[in-house]
């Protein structure tokens, strides 16, 4: 639950900061003429929200590989130092060739919890990394399946897709928050002289409330991408290997997630939530049981 709370607070903090900056630029400098004598200029507001909503997501996307390396301490394998590293590089190269993408960077990060992630702004400029814990606890067949899962994320363009979705929902949040803020300012506070305290306070409050809904939407898309990456893992490595790899993650799922907050949506697993919980709406990954059940229904050739 702490992981989910931190994730939501981070996203909401970003929205609030954008809200404050947006308010200063539009009211003090008149940027975009969002506020006019008759109230909000809806067209200008829509354009400005779209721009501001996408900026943060695009910056995060382009910095994703650099941030991932720093936050996880990933060491890229420039020249394999042992048979294990050589096998990792060769396996990723084989899988990348199978899905027709350029060879990603391959790295290892020091973490006792078995995990892995893929990131990068472009499918041909990606990074695939595995934890030391994964290499120590999984069999070669299971590691192969995990790598295939991550290559699936890269080949499917999941990093770009989630960044675009986050940008779109951020834009909608900012847009509707300001619509409500303007309504409250004019109708409740009877302010006809431009944006007042009612507008700014209401906009920030609505940013927070709508931000929760936006996070749930983004996480729903994230869960769907996990199913697709699992299917790619089954296609490249074999269904039995993929199921075995997911089963091998069960002990780790019972422990708190050790991945940095900004990387949890791109890892192969996240903390487990038993039974129904509101927290399930904010999970970046489906439960292992759901993922394994989907794989059992998978047939070769299925996308």
UniProtKB/Swiss-Prot annotation:
This enzyme's EC code(s): 3.4.24.-
PANTHER family: PROTEASE HTPX (PTHR43221:SF1)
Gene Ontology terms describing biological process: proteolysis
Name listed for the protein in its UniProt record: Protease HtpX
Family membership: Belongs to the peptidase M48B family.
Keyword terms, alphabetized: Cell inner membrane, Cell membrane, Hydrolase, Membrane, Metal-binding, Metalloprotease, Protease, Transmembrane, Transmembrane helix, Zinc
Class of this enzyme: hydrolase
Family matches, as InterPro entries: HtpX_protease (IPR050083), Pept_M48_protease_HtpX (IPR022919), Peptidase_M48 (IPR001915)
Pfam family, one: Peptidase_M48
Binding site for Zn(2+): 149, 153, 226
Main location: membrane
Gene Ontology, cellular component aspect: plasma membrane
Gene3D superfamilies assigned to the protein according to its UniProt record, in alphabetical order: Metalloproteases ('zincins'), catalytic domain
Location in the cell: Cell inner membrane
Active site positions: 150
Cofactor(s) annotated in UniProt: Zn(2+)
Regions that span the bilayer: 4-24, 42-62, 157-177, 200-220
């Amino acid at each position: 639950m702490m992981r989910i709370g931190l994730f939501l607070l981070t996203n909401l903090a970003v929205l609030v900061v954008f809200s404050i900056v947006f308010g200063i630029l539009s009211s003090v400098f008149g940027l975009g003429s969002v506020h006019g004598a008759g109230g909000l200029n809806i067209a200008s507001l829509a354009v400005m929200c779209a721009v501001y909503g996408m900026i943060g997501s695009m910056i995060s996307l382009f910095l994703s590989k650099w941030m991932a390396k720093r936050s996880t301490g990933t060491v890229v394998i420039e020249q394999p130092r042992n048979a294990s590293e050589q096998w990792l590089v060769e396996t990723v190269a084989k899988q990348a060739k199978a899905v027709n993408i350029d060879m990603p960077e391959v790295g290892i990060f020091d973490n006792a919890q078995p995990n892995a992630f893929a990131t990068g702004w472009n499918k041909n400029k990606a990074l695939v990394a595995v934890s030391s814990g994964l290499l120590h606890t999984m069999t070669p067949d299971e590691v192969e399946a995990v790598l295939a899962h991550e290559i699936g994320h890269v080949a499917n363009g999941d990093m770009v897709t989630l960044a675009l979705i986050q940008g779109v929902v951020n834009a909608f949040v900012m847009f509707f928050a300001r619509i409500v803020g303007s309504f409250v300012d004019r109708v409740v506070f009877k302010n006809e002289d431009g944006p007042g305290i009612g507008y700014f306070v209401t906009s920030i409050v609505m940013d927070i409330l709508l931000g929760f809904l936006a996070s749930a939407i983004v996480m729903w898309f994230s869960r769907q991408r996990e199913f697709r990456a699992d299917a790619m893992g089954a296609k490249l490595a074999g269904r039995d290997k993929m199921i075995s790899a997911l089963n091998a993650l069960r002990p780790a799922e019972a422990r708190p997630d050790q991945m940095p907050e900004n990387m949890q949506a791109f890892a192969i697993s996240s903390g487990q939530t038993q039974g129904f919980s509101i927290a399930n709406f904010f999970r970046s990954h489906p439960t292992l049981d759901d993922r394994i059940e989907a794989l059992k229904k998978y047939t070769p050739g299925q996308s």
